[in-house]
Amino acid sequence: MNCFKILHRIKTGKEGFMVFYISLFLILWLAAGFAVGMKQVYVDQLFDKAVIERLEKEANDHGHADRMIKQRVLYIAAVTVSGFISVYYEMKTIPQRRNIRKIEKNIMKLNQAKKRRMKRK
């Protein structure tokens, strides 16, 4: 059998439907991962200078943080390949982010109250 007969058989038989569904699943998998990667990099600003400086201080290794963190394209590619796993992780961290935002708001209110007290004195 030559290649054209094999391709025609795949397109017309049950194998063709299976290939179609596998390719559809892979496209959805990669699209979900890519969307999460773009969100983390550009919306959540994962590569913000303050975040990078904090991670460098924690790691005490400036070169390692420079190689691993500052390359946005590699990060987006890794998250793209991870697909729905990254979507699950993002959905899992939503309640934690809400708690963090509440804590940040409380800290901001305390700082404002402290500034008001300092102005009165």
Swiss-Prot record:
What is the membrane topology here? Multi-pass membrane protein
Per the record, GO CC terms?
A: plasma membrane
Q: Which UniProt keywords apply?
A: Cell membrane, Membrane, Transmembrane, Transmembrane helix
Q: Where in the cell is it found?
A: Cell membrane
Q: Does the UniProt entry include the keyword Transmembrane helix?
A: yes
Q: Which residues cross the membrane?
A: 16-36, 74-94
Protein name per the record: Uncharacterized membrane protein YndK
Q: Please name the source species.
A: Bacillus subtilis (strain 168)
The record lists the lineage as: Bacteria, Bacillati, Bacillota, Bacilli, Bacillales
